[in-house]
């Protein structure tokens, strides 16, 4: 169990806080307390594989698409698969339909010789939505998945209604340098008999193929992406930025991202009240790490749902 916690701490997104120490265990992983148990959540109403851009891409749908509220697309982090999003599905699926999928090489989607890139993964997400006949979706991505969500919003703006960025950056320098040192130290031995390795070997038993996959994901996250400020301003989807105050993402980067998306309200600063739905929203959870944020689905659902629903801001009467 401890080794499994260490592996998940190391690779939940391929991004951790703290460099390698003896035995390949990061300082973060060595000190991390056990995560509280999360509900298993609902069963998918539809699941399977679709031919998407040369992949047999695995997806799950919860609820009925095309009814009432805009569906929510969830995009997991690096090395993670649909199973990692169960707490988020459980939090949101009672109020809206939810779609989640495994990226190239992740979970039940086999890897191919195709190069990995955030742009390509964004195109894969767009192709999946179109294959499911979803005209427009709210999109929430975690870490690597947050970067993919940004590319989806940039490259396929008509498909994205609202955008929620969980512990993600739009530029490489938004991460602390220790993050990249930790990624560089990852190797296949750290994944031995982990859920990540077992899922991969169900569809691709070749050990060398798994090693190649790990290296591809490392390269993807080390190279990261560099979206310009102008591109960030041009995104049409209203945006919510969420990080932890002990995240791998620098807090000043999250604030910059928030401001580029129209965040900040001088009128509200002057009156002390918000009179209309803000252009962007920012959440910085206290005492919360990059991995810790994944355990806050219920807390964040109460903040994300009003954003997705355009709920008017509350202005309590003080006198």
Regions found by a protein language model. Name each.
Residues 235, 241-243:
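Short beta-strand/loop motif that positions the catalytic acidic residue
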Residues 90, 245-281, 285-288, 294:
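Conserved loop-alpha-helix segment in the C-terminal half of the alpha/beta-hydrolase fold
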Residues 215-231:
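Active-site nucleophile elbow and catalytic-triad environment of alpha/beta-hydrolase enzymes
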Residues 147-155, 161-197:
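Flexible "cap/lid" loop of the alpha/beta hydrolase fold
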Residues 36-56:
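N-terminal cap/lid segment of alpha/beta-hydrolase-fold proteins
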Residues 274-319:
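Catalytic active-site module of serine/aspartate enzymes centered on a nucleophile-bearing elbow/loop
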Residues 55-108:
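Conserved HGGG/HGGXW glycine-rich cap/lid loop of the alpha/beta-hydrolase fold
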Residues 100-140:
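Active-site loop/oxyanion-hole signature of alpha/beta-hydrolase fold enzymes
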């Amino acid at each position: 169990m401890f080794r499994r916690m260490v592996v998940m701490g190391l690779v939940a997104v391929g991004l951790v806080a703290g460099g390698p120490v003896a035995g390949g265990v990061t300082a973060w992983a060595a000190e991390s307390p056990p995560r509280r148990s999360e509900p298993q959540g609902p069963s998918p109403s539809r699941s399977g594989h679709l031919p998407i851009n040369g992949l047999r891409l695995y997806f799950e749908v919860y609820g009925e698409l095309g009814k009432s509220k805009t569906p929510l697309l969830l995009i997991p982090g690096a090395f993670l698969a649909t199973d990692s999003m169960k707490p988020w599905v459980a939090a949101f699926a009672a109020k809206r339909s939810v779609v989640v999928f495994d990226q190239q090489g992740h979970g039940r989607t086999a890897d191919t010789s195709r190069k990995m890139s955030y742009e390509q993964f964004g195109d894969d997400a767009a192709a999946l939505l179109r294959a499911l006949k979803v005209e427009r979706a709210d999109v929430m991505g975690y870490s690597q998945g947050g970067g993919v969500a940004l590319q989806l919003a940039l490259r396929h703006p008509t498909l994205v209604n609202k955008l929620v960025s969980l512990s993600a950056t739009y530029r490489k320098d938004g991460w602390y340098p220790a993050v990249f040192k930790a990624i560089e130290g990852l190797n296949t031995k750290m994944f031995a008999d982990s859920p990540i390795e077992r899922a991969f070997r169900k569809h691709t038993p070749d050990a060398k193929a798994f090693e190649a996959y790990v290296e591809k994901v490392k390269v993807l996250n080390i190279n990261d992406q560099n979206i310009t400020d102008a591109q960030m301003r041009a995104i049409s989807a209203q945006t919510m930025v969420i990080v932890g105050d002990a995240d791998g993402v620098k807090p000043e980067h999250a604030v910059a991202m928030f401001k580029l998306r129209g965040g900040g309200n001088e009128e509200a600063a002057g009156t002390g009240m918000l009179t209309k739905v803000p252009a962007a929203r920012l959440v910085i959870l206290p005492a919360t790490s990059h991995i810790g944020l994944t355990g806050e689905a219920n807390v964040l659902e109460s903040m994300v749902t009003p954003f997705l629903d355009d709920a008017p801001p509350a202005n309590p009467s003080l006198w």
